[in-house]
Every structure is written in C-alpha cells, then in structure tokens.
Amino acid sequence: MAGWFSSTSLLDEQVERATSSSLEDIALNLEISDLIRSKSVQPKEAMRSLKRRLENRNPNVQIATLKLTDTCVKNGGSHFLAEIASREFMDNLVSLLTTEGAPLNTDVKEKMLELIQDWAMAAQGRMDLNYLGETYRRLQSEGFRFPPKNEISGSMLESSAPPEWIDSDVCMRCRTPFSFMNRKHHCRNCGNVFDAQCSSKTLPLPHLGILQPVRVDDGCYAKLTSKSSLPSNLSDRSAFKNHSITKANAMEPRGARAEGGFDDDLRRALQLSLEEAQNKGSSGYVPSTRINDEPAKTTTQANHEEEEDADLKAAIEASLRDMEEHKKKHAAALKSNAAATDSSARDTTAATPLPKNPYELSPVEVENIHLFAALVDRLQHQPPGTILREPQIQELYESIGALRPKLARSYGETMSKHDTLLDLHAKLSTVVRYYDRMLEERLSSAYSQHSLGYGTVPGGSPYPNMYPTMPSHVPEGKTGAENFYYGNPVADRAPPVNNTYGYPQSSRDIREPAAAPSGPISSGMYNQPSQAVPQNPPWNGNAPSVASPQPSAPSTPFPNNPSGYPGPSASTQYYASAPHPEQDPNAYSSPRPGETDISHQPSPIMRRDSYYQSAGAPVTARASAPEQSPPTDQGQSPAYMQYGDSHPVQSTGQPTPQYQPTAPPPQSYYFQHQPQQSAPLPTHSQTPGAPHGTYPGGDVSPISAPAHAVHYQQVAPTKPAVEESLIEL
C-alpha cells in the first residue's frame, strides 16, 4: 500500500510540477510520457492522475493538464491511449463541458473540444478507440461548436512502447527447458523469455522511455551495441532475426532503432530526395557517385548501418547511381544531337533542342517515385507509427501526389503508343503471311513446271503410256515409206484386245490412198490374208468380241517368207515413182471414175487397241503438211463420223505403232511389218450381190479389217509398166 501511494505520489508530484500555473515545461512533459510509455507507471493510474488534475478550478492549470494529456496520448503508447478512450476519462470531459454550476472557462472549453476532435479524427478505423468517435459525434449532435478540423493521421497516436511479454516453457534462444533452478527472464527490448545464461546483460532503452539499465538478451544486446561493428557470431545474427520476427508478429512498436543507422540513412535519403525535387536543375545525388573514390567515408557509413537495412540502402544507392549515369548519358546525347543539328542547319536556323514531352516524368521524379515505393514496402513490415516519426516521408508523399496528373497523362500516351504498335504488328504479320503464301504458290508452280519438263506429253494423246517404246533408228538409211517393206518378215500377229470403247483417231494414223496408178491392178499382185468374214453390225460403239479367225479354203494365205512382198529393187523402182499422198490435195476431195463414193479408212479403235509393233524400225512421221481426212458419203455410219471428228488429232511428235491392213493398192504403199503373234480382225460385212472390185455401198464399219483382195480392189487407171514389174516379182 505504501509502495502504491509512493509511486502515485511521485507521479502526482511530477504532474503538479508540469501543470503549474507557470509556463509549460515541455521537457517535464516528455519525461512523464516516457514513464507512461516504459510502463514504469500503470496507464490507468496515470489517467486518473490527469483526471484529478483537471478538477482544479484554475483555467491555466486545466489548460496545462490538457496539453500534458495530449503529449502523453501521442507518446505514451497504445496501452495509455486505451485508458484515455475509456468511458471513465471521456465521460469526465463531457461532464466538465456540460456542467450547469460554475461555467467552464472559454479557453479551456475550446481547448477541450479541439483535443476531442483531434483524438476522434486520429482514432478513425480503430475498434479499440471507437468511443472517442462516439463522444465526438454526440457532442456535435448536442450543438457544441468545434474548431476547424485539422487533418491528423492515425499514425500520430502511435508510439514505441515496450512489447508485451511472451511466455514459454523453454528458452527462446538455446531451447533449454525452464526448471526450479533455471529461472525464466524476459527481455525488456523484445519481450521474449530467456534463461539466465542468455539474458545476463543489461542496457538502458531510451527509445522505449527506459533510461535505467534493464535486462536484455544476448541477441538484443548484440544488436544495440553493434553500431560500430557487425556481429561476427552467426548465432547472434539468427537470434536477432528471430527476435525481429517475433516482435513483428506481436504488432508492437519497433524496437531500438530510433537512433539506429536505418533512421539516419532514411532521413538522409529523404532529405536528399526532397532537395532534388525542389531543385530540378541540380545534378542529383552527387555523393553517391563518390562512393568508390572515398572508401574511408564508405567504411564510416557502413559502420552505422544496421544489418537488416543494408539491402535497402544498397538498392537506393544503386538506383541513385543508375539515375546519375542515365542523366549523364542523356545529357551527352542531347549535346551530340544539338551539335549535329547545328552543323547541318547552321546556314538556315540555329540548332534547337529536341522537343520534350511536357508530360514526361523527369529522372528525379521517377527516382522519387521508386524511392517512395521502396520505403513504403519496407515500412509495411515495421510496427505501426514508424512512418509518422519521419516528416520527410510525408513531404515526399505530397510531392509525389502532385505528379498524379502528369503520370496519368504519360501513362495514357504510353498506352496509345502501345495500341498503335500492336496494330502495326498485326498488319505486319498479315503482310508477312500473305507474302509467305505467294512464295509457296510460286515455288509449287515452279516445281510442277520442272517436273513436266522431263517428259513432254503429246497434246492429242489421252493415254500417253499406252504403247511401248519403239526404236528410232532407220536401218540402211532408207526412207519411212521404204522401211515398211525392208523390215523383218511378218509373223503371226497377236489377237487384238476386246475393247468395246473407241479411241480418238490420230491424223497420222489415217493412211489415205494416193493417186492410183493408171490402168487396172490385178488382185493377185498382193497376197491377202485368208480369214472368215463375220457379220458386222453397224458402228454404234458396241463392237462384238473378236474371235480367232479360221482359215478359209478359197482364200489365199499369207506367204511364210518375205518373198511374197515386193523386193528391194522392184519396190525401190516402183514406189519411188508413186505420188505422195499429200502431193495432190484433190486426190482426197473427189473420187475417181469407177470408184465408189465411200473411201475406206482404217478403224481408230483398231489402231488404238493395237498392241502390234513393227519388228524393224517404226514408221517415222512425215514432216510434210498435216494430213486431211477424206470426205465420206452418206453411206458411212453417223456414229462413226461423230466419234472420229470429236477427238483431237494426235501430235506427230510421238511414233504410233500401226496395223495397216491389206486394202486397196494405194493403202498397200504404207503396209507395215507387224510383230509375230497376230490375228486377223473383223472385216466389213459385204452386201450380198455386190460386185467384186468395189467397196460396199452400205454401212462401213470402222473396225473392219482387210478381207479378200477382190473386196478392196479399186477400179482406177493403171500403169502397165509398174503392173508388169510387180507381177514378175
């Protein structure tokens, strides 16, 4: 009881001296607030002492007590602030304002209303101090007139105070269990619990309002005394980090860093940033460029650094150095550009500096923004109220807040440039895609033309690979017409393939009769193949299957040796005098006397489906003028006429194997030696009663093959000399 009264009387004495009617003693007020913050005095007793002092009738004492209370509220810690926001203290103030007895002094009343308004404004958003706001709103509703509002941040009520003690069963440094012999002790700096071995050191803690030496653990002692040299022990470093984490989790005001290197460095950086913001033309943070040139000064500054703040300071210094280098490079670029412009336009106009965007942020402003962001991010991990003890941060915040319109305009221009860039990139991508497609199309076209160049397909042949390849050499240097008669002997021919579909007739497959020699030609001059004459229906595209021919008795067979054909000497004399089929165009247009109006033409189906090839040299295409089809009469089949005229003429560039039947003598000039395996083809169906020596006057089938020589003998003027020579052979 005596101790309690003695402590209360000690605080009361200090309060009486601080609130005397004389001038305000600021130093004594701060001492009282340090006692409250260090928890040397219970916060409730301090609140009651101030409440009793307000009962004094002297207005000066009341005003001094209100000022002392405001100082203790701003520096006494959250535990004392909770007592001030209690109903006991606030209701006492309201009762003083609403008393009906002795009226309250006007100055005291105004001061009281001002403090209530400031405390309520600073306590917004804090649930433990909500009664301050309720009292303020109640007084407003009752009609009290408050002075103009002052914008006060809630951090003004924050202050550093000793943390709350944490209980544990083991030492939080060496993990040794506590026992009857191993007592637990609390560190006054961090609030953690340690044994006697880990907390045997004592230090005063002025940043917490503790001026006398108190017990601290080894980690806090190393941190507080390592301002001149960094801790060399790894365990101390880990313990220091553990204490910092524990203290941050406790959400208590920060520890012994009021006089640490972080505050000094932060204050110095803020001061330099403000100077740069005010003086836009300055060269920036000059001392940062001299760090490498002054190692002694750097070492001195490093001695005052704290370990956890080294990274932040290094980042700030690096950013300042980068900004300085960027400014130098920019200035050099401006000078070079100005010099180049001056040299090029010296005769016309003076050199003008590059146009600068008025909304572009200067390097100093950009650096201030980055510095403020780094500081805010760093202070987020600090206890509440730390930012308020540094007025330079508030000034930096105000200077950066003025840059918001400028930053918004710059951001808008950057976004428009970005959109333009995206549009141009999309257009460029489209153009490149179209260009690649064009290149691919041209490349494929070039490949197709290159592949076609290796084997040229004839223009009029729908089936270019239908016939086998024929040798191109001509034996003994004889002409194409003579090669038909100087080749190997004609062997048996293979039967043709039964194909019911016709193929287009080539112009060079049609061998037209030339001008017949004068005088009759004997039918016995050429031996015709002996074969049966089947009944052939009219040409309608459905040809019957070709059967193997049976030899006929009255027919004269082919000779087995080539002696039956004209010899070389006779043929040379005879066929050299024979007119060329294309020399007389009138030979195709008008028939001769005694001939029928229908000219016999070999069937295109017979020539297309023929698998015969010459045993010797192939028939070489004549390089003369194109051959013309002879006119046909009404007796020819209309289907055959339409089919023969509807297909293109085959190109003469490729030799075509042919089977030339033994027909009228003019067609015998072009008879071709055939391969060995062969069979006769169907012939024309002869009209009953038709005289020998004339063509049939009825339907002429295009697939008709040569029949007996008398069927195809043509009445024409003869040449006796040639006939006699052939008969002799």
Curated annotation (Swiss-Prot):
GO function terms (MF aspect): phosphatidylinositol-3-phosphate binding; ubiquitin binding; zinc ion binding
Bilayer topology annotation: Peripheral membrane protein
Region (Disordered): 276-310, 323-358, 485-709
Record's compositionally biased regions (Polar residues): 279-290, 497-507, 520-534, 626-639, 671-688
Subcellular location: Endosome membrane
VHS domain mapped to chain residues: 16-147
One cellular-component annotation, GO: ESCRT-0 complex
InterPro entries per UniProt: ENTH_VHS, HGS/VPS27, UIM_dom, VHS_dom, Vps27_GAT-like, Znf_FYVE, Znf_FYVE-rel, Znf_FYVE_PHD
Biased composition (Low complexity): 333-352, 650-661
Keywords: Endosome, Membrane, Metal-binding, Repeat, Zinc, Zinc-finger
Pfam family, one: VHS
Domain UIM residues, every copy: 261-280, 307-326
Pro residues bias (residue ranges): 551-560
Residues in FYVE-type zinc fingers: 165-225
Main location: membrane
Single Gene Ontology BP annotation: protein transport to vacuole involved in ubiquitin-dependent protein catabolic process via the multivesicular body sorting pathway
Function: Component of the ESCRT-0 complex which is the sorting receptor for ubiquitinated cargo proteins at the multivesicular body (MVB) and recruits ESCRT-I to the MVB outer membrane.
Subunit description: Component of the ESCRT-0 complex composed of HSE1 and VPS27.
Entry note about domains: The FYVE domain is involved in the binding to phosphatidylinositol 3-phosphate (PtdIns(3)P) which is required for the association to endosomal membranes. Both IUM domains are necessary for efficient binding to ubiquitin.
Family: Belongs to the VPS27 family.
Name of this protein: Vacuolar protein sorting-associated protein 27
The encoding gene: vps27
